[in-house]
Amino acid sequence: MIIWLAELLQPYLSFFRLFEYLSFRAILSVLTALGLSLWMGPIMIKRLQMLQIGQVVRNEGPESHFSKRGTPTMGGIMILAAISITILLWTDLSNPYVWAVLTVLLGYGAIGFVDDYRKVVRKNTDGLIARWKYFWQSLIAFVVAFALYAYGKDTAATQLVVPFFKDIMPQLGLMYIILTYFVIVGTSNAVNLTDGLDGLAIMPTVLVAAGFAVIAWATGNVNFSEYLHIPYLPHASELVVVCTAIVGAGLGFLWFNTYPAQVFMGDVGSLALGGALGTIAVLVRQELILVIMGGVFVMETLSVILQVGSYKLRGQRIFRMAPIHHHYELKGWPEPRVIVRFWIISMVLVLIGLATLKVR
């Protein structure tokens, strides 16, 4: 929005030429989203407390979690508001990639909102019925996948980029739609599973978004994309501003979500942020690097799959409790230790993911 206004005012005030620079808008994006989150945080927490919208805690969970019962949840609303406002302010709204991310972010946020509402307001511990949750997630993912495929059919936008290999970029064809579906839905649910401790999900989300900001910048730059042997996608550069909006909003939320948390993001935040990260990975053609950079999310998801599979096949559990962060809690690790160590793992994995761009 601002970029259009700046174009109109450039002939009169040269200052507005600054808004043409991606780096300038990326910095403003971080600061705007951070400021909005910090401003909305106390208001949101107070409002949620007044409405008695508090966290539901499972009785079979770690005893240390019982004290969290009643902590305001659905704080993801302020994350989505900060990201959305920032994107509308600082991105080029004629860019289709921006709208693809916004569609998934707000669509999955709506699904998470209904799920949270049923849990904490209607006191239905199951929330939104699983099959309906997956139906709406799938519908949104397929709509976005079909739209992106139609827009970039048989171009670099539908190639598969394989880490460590500079000459292996097969054209996916219709498989692009299937891959896009699984990446968006899978990442959304993976972040949702990770969101079980104070700040555990939001910091890896911030780190992965920061990593994708670098990748989006390189992908949208003709010289660097050629140098790194990755597809050149001119629309991808605008995703830098989207990623930095996620970084800023996430850091602002972490201010209130750090241990001991004053507010939780709820499904409205985790499903939306995961879906947005998956969409960004698809748009910059780095789905496989997402598996590396988002390794904490992958680890949490695999722990659940292995736990359920082992119990059904052998009648035995592999972990004391899944997702795996609860396993370490039950082993006696203090919650802050689990959180910070997972953050460190996430930071290392993001750096490894970025390194793969050069190691080819």
Swiss-Prot record:
Subcellular location(s) per record: Cell inner membrane
Record's bilayer topology term: Multi-pass membrane protein
EC identifiers of the protein: 2.7.8.13
Any one cellular-component term (Gene Ontology): plasma membrane
Keywords of this entry: Cell cycle, Cell division, Cell inner membrane, Cell membrane, Cell shape, Cell wall biogenesis/degradation, Magnesium, Membrane, Metal-binding, Peptidoglycan synthesis, Transferase, Transmembrane, Transmembrane helix
InterPro entries found in the cross-reference section: Glycosyl_transferase_4 (IPR000715), PNAcMuramoyl-5peptid_Trfase (IPR003524), PNAcMuramoyl-5peptid_Trfase_CS (IPR018480)
Record-level GO BP terms: cell division; cell wall organization; peptidoglycan biosynthetic process; regulation of cell shape
Pathway(s) per entry: Cell wall biogenesis; peptidoglycan biosynthesis
Enzyme class: transferase
Chief localisation class: membrane
Superkingdom of the source species: Bacteria
Gene Ontology molecular functions: metal ion binding; phospho-N-acetylmuramoyl-pentapeptide-transferase activity; UDP-N-acetylmuramoyl-L-alanyl-D-glutamyl-meso-2,6-diaminopimelyl-D-alanyl-D-alanine:undecaprenyl-phosphate transferase activity
Names of required cofactors: Mg(2+)
Catalyzed reaction equations: UDP-N-acetyl-alpha-D-muramoyl-L-alanyl-gamma-D-glutamyl-meso-2,6-diaminopimeloyl-D-alanyl-D-alanine + di-trans,octa-cis-undecaprenyl phosphate = di-trans,octa-cis-undecaprenyl diphospho-N-acetyl-alpha-D-muramoyl-L-alanyl-D-glutamyl-meso-2,6-diaminopimeloyl-D-alanyl-D-alanine + UMP
The UniProt record lists the keyword Aminoacyl-tRNA synthetase: no
Ranges that cross the membrane: 26-46, 70-90, 94-114, 132-152, 168-188, 199-219, 236-256, 263-283, 288-308, 338-358
Disulfides per UniProt: none
Family: Belongs to the glycosyltransferase 4 family. MraY subfamily.
Role according to the record: Catalyzes the initial step of the lipid cycle reactions in the biosynthesis of the cell wall peptidoglycan: transfers peptidoglycan precursor phospho-MurNAc-pentapeptide from UDP-MurNAc-pentapeptide onto the lipid carrier undecaprenyl phosphate, yielding undecaprenyl-pyrophosphoryl-MurNAc-pentapeptide, known as lipid I.
Protein name according to UniProt: Phospho-N-acetylmuramoyl-pentapeptide-transferase
